[in-house]
Amino acid sequence: MAEPIALLAFWKNYDRRLYLRAAQLADELGYHSFWLPEAWGYEVFALLTEMAVHTKRIQLGTGIVNVYSRTPGLIAMSAATVDEISEGRFILGVGVSGKNVIEGFHGRPFEKPLSQVRDVVKVTRALLAGQKESEAGATLAQYRPFKLEMKPLRASVPIYVAALRQKAIEQIGECADGWIPTFWPYDKLAEGRAWIAAGAARAGRDASKIVTAPFTTALPLGGEGGTTMAKQIISFYIGGMGDYYIELLTRFGFGEDCKRIADLYADKATRAQAADAVTPGMIEALTIAGDPAHCIGELRRRRSFGVDLPILNLPTNMPWEMLEAFIRGMAPAT
């Protein structure tokens, strides 16, 4: 059996028709799943419904939907709906997003992120299982004894959580089915998996059944193309995506590099130089760059560090011909 590989559409400059075509090709080639992001453009459950109608086998995931802009009940309703239309192929990926998006775009207070994630997981599980919402064990609201006015296709859908901090990762062990880390050095995954195991032990769960599914930047481009793009992506996440990744990478020994990159990125006059400050060590730890054969071999090697399901970020701002070459080149071996 081929080792599972998934694909993730990039959230910036999103082209709906292009990614629908990509999902159809991934379905034909035997990819495990296709994940769609949600930022401040397209609404993700509607897009996944469209993909469900036009694909046959591939699983479809939210990568990720934030836990603030919809109520837990609405997330459960949406999950049940897409799961039915896809005939049981839906995966719910959730996370907290960030303060700028939640407060600045959605107008919701960015508060109690751990409790917010936990309530979404608990309410979704309860409602899909046919239970009353008041029985979910949620803590942020006093729910009345509502049940879904439909019978979900499955009594449970897989729930993956994007998280970078210890308490949030331990909570995955307590209640979720998968962990989605981003820009977590692959050779440090054991730390996060140990936190999952600690949470699972407290809840009496089997940690070995919890999937580690990192969003993975693979750049199978010849020459210096992959390295150049890797530098641009890393500098963007460090300089333009808040403190999450700086905090994470500083803990893993990249603090000075992150500060230098962030300082350059903060000034528009020097922003172009931020990519040049990305070191070879950061590229090696956070991405896979090189010719296709190297990327495939490296992806296989990194599974030994605890990667169960690599979710490959599809390159952005590329014509269909290049996107198709990526999908075919990185497809799971049959």
What are the functions of these language-model segments?
Residues P4-R17, V65-P72, L153-L164, A218-L221, ...:
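Active-site mouth loops of central-metabolism enzymes
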Residues F45-V65, S69, Q116-V123, R202, ...:
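Alpha-helix-loop-beta-strand connector modules within alpha/beta enzyme cores
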